[in-house]
Amino acid sequence: MTENNNNNNNNNNNNNNNNNNNNNNNNNNNNNNNNNNNINNNNNSNNQIQQPQLQVNEGINPKPLVIGLNKSFQVNGENNTTSINNNNNNNNNNNNNNSSSNIPAPSNTFTFKAGIPSSGRQRTLSPLGSKNVTFSTNVENQSTTTKIDETINNNNNIYSNSNNNNNSNNSTNSNNSNNNDDNNGRTENIENNTIQDSNSNSNSNDNENNRSNSFNTTVNGNNVNSNHINNNNNHNNNNNNNNNNNNNNNIVYNIQKQSFNKLNGSGSSEIFQFDEECEEELEEQQKQNENKTGSSAEEQQQQQQKQKQQQQQQEDVDDEDDQIITVEGGNRSRSNGLMQELKLGTSLPVGIPSRLSQSLQTPSQIQQQKKQEQQLASSIFTSNINPSTQTNNNNNNNNSNYSNRNISSTTYNERKKYVTPRDSWVDILKEKEEMESSFEISQSLKRKQSYKSYI
């Protein structure tokens, strides 16, 4: 009996020692996890300067927002069925390689209810009120990817010096103790120093950018780095950046177009309908230039001249259409007045002698008038004559004009027009009044003529 009791005590002591060892192992693991968390926190503080995507600063892990979804609808990552609340509880115990980079991990995304303001609820209680959301318009460049690679290499060196600890993504949870349950409810066995996780060691790509994150695996106590995947995917990242830029430009153009249509009130895509003809002409010219790139400059000039001639012909046709429309055999215009064919450029103050003055003049007077006009023209426009002779001729002409009273008063008035137009117009109006008064028909004669016309 005493031997059995001693054996039992020894077994109990051994079990206690084993438990103590396990506890020590767990404590060591917790210490290592805490160290890793501190390292990750430092990396996060360094890498928060450049944020290539929309991120939410929530704890350690930056995760994208999905706006407009309820909590009941949960978006899960690949090969992972854990809920959001469990992930929130397990974030403190998990080691995160992706925290060193600004690229969000392909883990679960946070969802929340849309904040709809009501009468009893303030607008400041929206979901975005308690979270710091940063928006970046620019897409990350190659410089950011190189910095990310450098930080990943530094972190890998730190992890390799930490007694071959297990490093995994947010979706993997591993413990060194045998048959210990994780917070996620998953068990993991260690056989021959190899880790058998439910999730694969390779990281799943992001939602749309096809980026691969660096990861560490422990095989027989040795750390294996996979940073070469990031180097291979730099080209893909550049292509995705170009596609993102094109998409952003298209989105901005569509927004501007919609806002302009709203301001215009039409809402149609064809804003300027009157410019369609001009656009067609421009397209035709571009096609002609493309088809005739090898043609000579002379042919192009000839084509341009032909186009100008055609345009002028069209303009002439339009001008003819815009002319006065005649009615009733061409005798009347739109104003119902008699058409008067007056050439442009004719000025009204030109001295036109009345028919009465012309009829009263004798042939001798007309000849004398012509001679005087010729003398005036010769004295003004000839340069061979001395100035003294010119003045003498002018004086003689003036004296002859004033002395010869046989010439009718119309010639005097016509010459006077070029000096004082107002007096000339007054004289012309007086002559017209005299003519009208002399040729007036009495009312009795007018009545007789009108009576005869009716008969």
Curated annotation (Swiss-Prot):
Biased composition (Low complexity): 1-47, 79-103, 151-182, 192-250, 298-314
Region called Disordered, residue ranges: 1-48, 77-250, 276-338, 383-407
Polar residues bias locations: 119-146
Protein name: Putative uncharacterized protein DDB_G0274535
Species of provenance: Dictyostelium discoideum
